[in-house]
Amino acid sequence: DFVDAHNAARAQVGVGPVHWTVDAYARQYANDRNLVHSATR
């Protein structure tokens, strides 16, 4: 996982870790929305 490698490099310079949250955001976004079809001509 590239986030683990990135966090290892950050730890070497004394910076805190980052967290991968785009998957949780996308899942929540999809669950909160309703599929609506547009009117056709």
Swiss-Prot record:
GO biological process assignments: defense response
Keyword tags: Allergen, Pathogenesis-related protein, Plant defense
Tagged with keyword Nucleotidyltransferase: no
InterPro entries assigned to the protein according to its UniProt record, in alphabetical order: CAP_sf
Keyword S-adenosyl-L-methionine attributed: no
Family: Belongs to the CRISP family.
UniProt function note: Probably involved in the defense reaction of plants against pathogens.
Protein's name in the database: Pathogenesis-related protein
Lineage: Eukaryota, Viridiplantae, Streptophyta, Embryophyta, Tracheophyta
